[in-house]
Amino acid sequence: MSYPQGYLYQPPGSLALYSCPAYGASALAAPRSEELARSSSGSAFSPYPGSAAFTAQAATGFSSPLQYSSDPAGFPSYMGSPYDAHTTGMTGALSYHPYGSAAYPYQLNDPAYRKNATRDATATLKAWLQEHRKNPYPTKGEKIMLAIITKMTLTQVSTWFANARRRLKKENKMTWAPRNKSEDEDDDEGDGERVKEEQSEKAQDCNETSAEDEGISLHVDSLTDHSCSADSDGEKLPCRATDHLCESGSESKEKYDDDEDEEEGDEEDRVLPVKPATSSPLTGVEAPILNHQQDGSPRNSNKTSLDNGMSPSSQTPASKPKLWSLAEIATSDHKHSNLGSVLSSATSSAAHNPSYPSSSLLGRHIYYTSPFYSNYTNYGNFNALQSQGILRYSSAAVTANEGLNQTVLSTSSMHKHTSDSVRTASNQLDQHYRPTNFESKKDPSEVCTVGVQPYP
């Protein structure tokens, strides 16, 4: 490798690292002056016979791969002096093209290499094409021969023939029969046409397979939907068969309508049973599973309170039916403000909320003290009726019914007793599903003091 004219070449002796001592125990023990004197003849990384590293290796018995009898010259014999480029040696190095190599026959600056086809080259190709008008498909050997004659590459020759055939097709001068490309021929046009045809066929196949896959996926989705629906129905059936505790608001309403049609015939013979509140008509969220096995005594005591403690609203004319509306519940607090002394023991836990009187416990339906109702109104929860957010009928209903019995005894002279308890209970169930905005302004005197409201 040669260097340019103005390049300052430094011999290996001047590139020695004077600050880096040679490696080895003897080198460390050697005098500093001798090391500096010997370092001028060799580098620390390629030790020569005069360096300290070479003497250390020789002392330990290792032979150096660079065994010179004397100091080597700055340049080998085949290289000339860098400062005299025109002397003997590599005189032609400066004129050699740096991008050329022996493996590439046509150099970039070689006049034999033709970048663009000239008229002479195309004239040769046209002459061959004119002779082979009936079969303008040159073989591999013919292409190589034409490439050598025209000094073009095989790619250029193949491209020129493909363009010539395409041009003749457009000019309707096609004098040959189209044929398939043989194995030993390199036809660009045939390749392009076949690639296009194969791509179109593959696209059609992909469309068909995608349609089939979509059909299969749709079939699988439908099967999974049916199976999921069947599983969900199977899960819902035992809940519906055993009890009403897993029904939502709309389902319980529809089931209540069906049950009401069946029970209309024998309403006069038996008393309509009171069902626990299982879901909220406002939210549609499933209510928590209640401890309904311990509801026997509250329900039995509630029947007597229903017989004796019905409000005048159920006995008034039909122009003002009873309605459990939010406005009526709000006004019920003022009606029962005089019952605070009687119910002080039952509502002692609600005394922490000063905004609501202590007598509002019985003025409000027990169902509306559920955890779901406080999310949609401004009424707070009652800790006496809730234990960790779950409505407990086993303890709350008993306390409420005890207060109800006292209220009924104290106010029995003010109300008219009724013997038709079935009719009043059914009226309450029918009026329970009326819209809440119906008769928003209700007389405060028309308030029912019933404990557990029957709700399907």
Curated annotation (Swiss-Prot):
Supply the PROSITE patterns for this chain. Answer: HOMEOBOX_1, HOMEOBOX_2
Q: Name the source organism.
A: Xenopus tropicalis
GO CC annotation: nucleus
Q: Which GO terms describe its molecular function?
A: DNA binding; DNA-binding transcription factor activity, RNA polymerase II-specific
Its recorded name reads Iroquois-class homeodomain protein irx-2
Q: Does the keyword Transcription apply?
A: yes
Gene3D superfamilies, alphabetically?
Answer: Homeodomain-like
Q: What does this protein do?
A: Acts partially redundantly with other irx members in neural patterning. Required for formation of the posterior forebrain, midbrain, hindbrain, and to a lesser extent, spinal cord. Acts early in neural plate development to induce expression of some but not all proneural genes, and specify a neural precursor state. Also up-regulates repressors that prevent neuronal differentiation. Patterns the neuroectoderm in both the anterior/posterior and dorsal/ventral axes. Probably dispensable for pronephric kidney development.
User: What does the sequence similarity comment in the record state about its family?
Assistant: Belongs to the TALE/IRO homeobox family.
Basic and acidic residues: compositionally biased ranges = 192-205, 246-256
Q: What is its main location?
A: nucleus
Note the DNA-binding span(s) on this chain: 110-172
